[in-house]
Amino acid sequence: MLKAGVFEPARQAPDFSLASSAGHELKISQYRGRVVLLAFGFTSCTEVCPTTLNTFALARRKLGPAAAEVQVVYITVDPQRDVPARLAKYLGSFDPTFIGGTGTEEQLAAVRKSYGISAEKKTIGNDYSYAHSSFTYLIDRTGRIRALMPYGHSPDDYANDLTILLKE
């Protein structure tokens, strides 16, 4: 049984085209045949985002060789700072297979809207941060959104759900 909230019925994950941290075009549809963890955040985040990405890395390790069939896709909410090279360095500190996506404000707003993600820029003195949705989409091998995992779940919960989706 999935630990995450289940989408019933499952729906196709909205596709998008962004610049990837690997230097090519990023589309969610390119990962058909693999299970995807899709999350949104930003590299300057100090709490939720690094905790989530570390959880993904630990969950993938628990899967052993099956981890090769899981792709983490992390879409920034901060295009001013999160250029592809910065995303690559940041994500690589958690797991070198993680892929980040960035684009223009307009492109990212459209992707967020299609996934129901909110992100609000907050000014803090001379700096800024973001308040944003912190759940993760679990997308199956056929590109369907199967579940939504809220922030705070353990690596074991993710490994459980990924194992179920990988067996389908």
Could you say what each language-model-derived stretch is?
Residues M1-D15, A19, E168:
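N-terminal targeting signals for export/organelle localization
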Residues E106-D161:
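Thiol/disulfide oxidoreductase modules built on the thioredoxin-like
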Residues F16-V36, R60:
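A short beta-strand-turn-helix
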Residues A13-P14, V36, S133-S134:
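Short loop/turn microsegments at loop-to-beta-strand junctions
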Residues R11, V35, R60-A67, F98, ...:
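Sec/Tat-exported extracytoplasmic proteins
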Residues T51-V111:
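Structural microenvironment flanking redox-active thiols in thiol-disulfide oxidoreductases
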Residues I28-F56:
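Short active-site neighborhood of thiol/selenol oxidoreductases, capturing the structured segment around
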